[in-house]
Amino acid sequence: MRKPDQITIDRALLLYLLHAVEPHGLLGDVKLQQLGFLCELQMFNRGLKAFHFEFVRYAYGAFSKDLDNDLLSLRRKERVENFSPSEKASEVLTLLNEAVDGVKQNEEVIDILQAVVDRYGPLDSSEVTKSVEAVELSTPEQPTLNLPIRDISFHTTLLVPSRIEVSSEFTVPSPRLARLSTAMGY
């Protein structure tokens, strides 16, 4: 279960992801889920933790209920319209950029997120899903065997951030975290 500070960071980074992918055109639920998964996976591969979304195998690649709930919550708070950050989200993005500047691990997280968006943002949803389904992971049932996600049973857990050890994590000092939360309407 995510802690309140993790939820705040997840929502702020989700807004950043939506902002970063916006120039690439139409975005839908499936593509957003796949981009979130790829970002989180790449961060873990680099020993970093930023998003705290648990992902399961779904009909279209990977799916996170936490990511879905955060998106709905940001829509209710009028920080997201469809899949684009609203005017009310601009303060959140400014505060997040301030939290990133000069903090090595935070800068690395944003670099990874941007690299994923640059690589997969221009692709359509089905192409991104195919890329996700080609990723090889081990499952809790078979921890020594790596399988492409397309061969893993539906609803099987793919990523559990709380169980993954990393060398550093995206951090925001408490006062700025409170300002981020307020800027998001919480």
Task: Describe each model-derived feature in a short phrase.
Residues 1-186:
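Domain-edge interaction signal
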